[in-house]
């Protein structure tokens, strides 16, 4: 079975290692994904997220950090031309199927990287970015998230049902859909998701979110969201992070177990339809006790 995984934070991890003076190889490394394991797992396509922090003490410039990760992406393509192929279009996927190579597609996790500039958004598209979240865990000029760093142990907690998309955020959604860049609602507030359901003219994705009825974490989607997204033909990606799978009230003991993955997967299919379920593992960017 060919694997298409639409979220990992490998580019950020490679950048952090490079900044620390301890660069890691993409061929084989101690992360959760490398080229050797892509081959072993029969990967067809891996979406490579440019993840950036908005905290000034973490990044001098979110846009510069994003561009540095895009540079790493292109250097990987240059380093492994016989093994890797960039995917920008549906036609590229058809070519990929007969190429014997592994595909990689650029995405962005944190719309704040654009610094509220539609021009920057279009430039990222020109560089190959084909999917972007409006937020990570920080409020930005586009929208508000459902959680903030340091509060993940506050579980369950009220969802953000009032802070949705800003006017600039609505402009971004319109431009992304014009460009055919996928809008990713993972990390977005409840209010923001409903804003997008109201204005979106094309299907969108929740790249790494589970079912809130199965685990009452605000990063997961409500029944009403699942149904509405199913009706719009959206994709909902199962997230393997233990915090979004396990209902153990002792949050220090949560585990990422296959039984919970299957429980969430079945529930999402029941509410949104089997064509809506995808496996966007978030396989790099999570920690904890992982069974898979």
Residue ranges of model-derived segments:
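Loop-centered beta-sheet repeat module
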Residues: 159-209
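N-terminal hydrophobic targeting/anchoring segments and the immediately downstream early-domain regions
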Residues: 1-158, 216-292
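Histidine- and/or cysteine-centered catalytic micro-motif in compact active-site loops
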Residues: 188, 209-211, 239-243
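Short, glycine/acidic-enriched loop or turn micro-motifs at the edges of active sites
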Residues: 8-10, 187-190, 211, 285
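Aromatic-anchored, glycine/proline-accented short structural segments
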Residues: 192-232
């Amino acid at each position: 079975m060919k694997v298409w995984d639409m979220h990992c934070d490998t580019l950020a991890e490679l950048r952090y290692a490079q900044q620390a003076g301890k660069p890691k190889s993409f061929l084989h490394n101690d992360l959760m994904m490398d080229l050797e394991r892509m081959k072993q797992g029969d990967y067809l396509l891996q979406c490579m997220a440019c993840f950036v922090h908005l905290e000034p003490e973490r990044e001098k410039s979110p846009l510069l950090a994003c561009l540095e990760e895009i540079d790493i992406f292109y250097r990987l393509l240059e380093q492994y031309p016989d093994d890797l192929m960039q995917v920008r279009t549906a036609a590229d996927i058809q070519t990929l199927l007969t190429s014997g190579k592994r595909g990689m597609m650029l995405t962005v996790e944190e719309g704040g990287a654009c610094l509220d500039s539609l021009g920057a958004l279009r430039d990222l598209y020109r560089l190959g970015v084909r999917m972007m979240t409006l937020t990570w865990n920080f409020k930005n000029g586009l929208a508000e998230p459902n959680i903030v760093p340091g509060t993940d142990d506050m579980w369950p907690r009220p969802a953000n049902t009032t802070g949705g998309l800003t006017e600039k955020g609505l402009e971004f959604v319109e431009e992304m859909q014009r460009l055919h860049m996928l809008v990713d609602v993972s990390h977005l507030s409840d209010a923001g998701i409903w804003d997008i359901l109201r204005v979106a003219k094309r299907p969108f994705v929740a790249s790494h979110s589970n079912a809130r009825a199965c685990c009452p974490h605000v990063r997961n989607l409500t029944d009403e969201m699942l149904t509405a997204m199913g009706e719009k033909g959206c994709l909902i990606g199962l997230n393997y992070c233990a915090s979004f799978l396990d209902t153990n009230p002792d949050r220090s003991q949560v585990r990422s177990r296959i039984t919970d993955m299957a429980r969430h997967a079945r529930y999402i299919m029941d509410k949104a339809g089997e064509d809506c379920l995808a496996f966007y593992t978030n396989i790099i960017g999570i920690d904890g006790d992982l069974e898979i």
